[in-house]
Amino acid sequence: MLLERTRAEKEELIKQGKIKRDKKESIIFKGDDNSYYEKLGNTDVCIDHKLPFTLPDGWTWCVLPEIAEIIMGSSPDGTTINNSNEGIEFHQGKIFFTNKMLNPSDKSTTQPSKIAPKDSVLLCVRAPVGELNITDRSICIGRGLASIHPYHYIDAEWLFYWLQTYKGYLNMKATGSTFVAITADIVKTILMPLPPLKEQEEILKTINKVFFIVDLIEKSLN
């Protein structure tokens, strides 16, 4: 099963010291009674009431940290930020977001604090909360962003499209008086329906085909 592969990969990364085990680690599993449970420490809690729909055969529910490494941004020292391409590209928020792929920033830093690895989904955790993009290169991210880096068997583009459906949920969870924001704990509680890899690929083909047709229609109207 795909989820077992991603869990095994995560455990190996923890053993190698490349990532740390979450102190509030949560695991979703299906019980013998066909109900879904969330394992928190030594406690198993039924979560059937939280699930919005029934999954197709072969799919399973999981929480986001089971299939991706989540890295919350942290701004580097202001004196290390420059406009002369020294160091690594730096992004504070969504200024250089596009419809999907991240544009280059005009700022860099020589002392990066938090790195979003190549092929990460970038999530705005400060207003406007829930905006998403994909980076095809490693970048430094500030406090306005989180990096969601999928494990080997999860497609970043599929994750990008699926997370779009959570924008309303994330905004509902956002708090703050001047600028609303969401915490790491909120991001880590996102429930994901996980299809087999082949079905991820089929979903992506369908989505990209639809967008291609929409693009052709828009061009014909201009």
Segment roles from a protein language model:
Residues 45-74, 197-205, 210-222:
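Non-catalytic DNA-recognition/assembly elements of restriction-modification systems
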Residues 63-71, 96-97, 118, 131-194:
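Basic, amphipathic alpha-helical recognition segments used for DNA target recognition
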Residues 1-44:
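Extended, domain-scale alpha-helical bundle/helix-rich regions
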Residues 57, 89, 180:
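Residues that recognize and position ribonucleotide moieties
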